[in-house]
Amino acid sequence: MPVGTNNFNLIGITQKTNSSLDPATAVKGADATVDVGVLQYTRAFSLAGNASALAVVMPFGEVRGEVTLSGPLGNNTITRESSSSGLGDVSVLGVFGIVGSPAMTRQQYAQFKPGFSLGALAMITAPTGTYDDEKLINLGTNRWAFRVGAPFGWAIGDSYLSPRLTTIEFVPSVTFYSDNDAPFRAGNRSQEALYRIEGHLTHNFNRAFWVSADLTANTGGETTTDGKSDKNSKTWTGGGLTAGMNFSPAFGVSATYGGILSGNDAAPEGDGFRINGRYTF
């Protein structure tokens, strides 16, 4: 984005899954519905002559469902219903250009011929969301998360505003977690790092309409509760398709359908829809 650009996004998400809004919280035996909105504000600026941006992300809404647990004798099951509503965990995200993404004015941005680019990503998620240690399913996570990554990719076209622009982007990243000091029916829960790589292929069909195909691969995230491993390391792949329409330079809407394509027994499950409205000024 050109330096000085502001984006407001209002996102609606509905999904059937076995986790909260964060897939790293997947619980085997859970059957949950997540209905949330997300407010995001992004500001583009120059850092050491490179294009950079900061974003603040605030989710809100409800997660509800039921969890099937093993009974006290191990040979029967117990089903517990649960719901959580309110605000989710707030995130602050920074993306910083390193190669191929100079800071530009709007006029320079329109004339710039893109190519390869490499950047750095850093995100902090704070435990601000609704959380109750008597519930297995919560909107908040009661722990900090720290994500770092190195997005890189190629843009093929005469400019970023080209009506036939194609972009290929990869985002390798790792997320680290602090301990949850009030997990369900326990005293402490730690979680190993989660490793992730995203791939995005986006093509403009004209100045207004574009589509994107998305893939992710994830592994890690095993938890340890009160010093005992939960043996729930997660490995999964996910995918999705997005179609977007720009009604003007200031306003656009996109719709995404996506879900889990494959995974082990501890992995998140399900699929969902997302609608994203964008206002740029």
What are these regions (language model features)?
Residues 8-16, 54-60, 118-126, 166-176, ...:
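Transmembrane beta-barrel strands of outer-membrane/channel proteins
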Residues 18-25, 65-73, 105-110, 130-137, ...:
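Outer-membrane beta-barrel translocator domains and adjoining extracellular loop/strand segments
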Residues 10, 39-43, 92-98, 122, ...:
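Residues on the lipid-exposed face of transmembrane beta-strands in outer-membrane beta-barrel proteins
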Residues 19, 180-281:
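Outer membrane beta-barrel transmembrane domains
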Residues 33-102:
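Long, hydrophobic/aromatic-enriched structural stretches that serve as scaffold segments
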Residues 1-4, 46-52, 100-117, 157-166, ...:
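Short loop/turn motifs that connect adjacent beta-strands in outer-membrane beta-barrel proteins
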Residues 14-36, 80, 136-137:
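Surface-exposed strand-loop-strand hairpins of Gram-negative outer-membrane beta-barrel proteins
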Residues 4, 31-37, 50, 81, ...:
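Residues that define the transmembrane beta-barrel architecture of outer-membrane proteins
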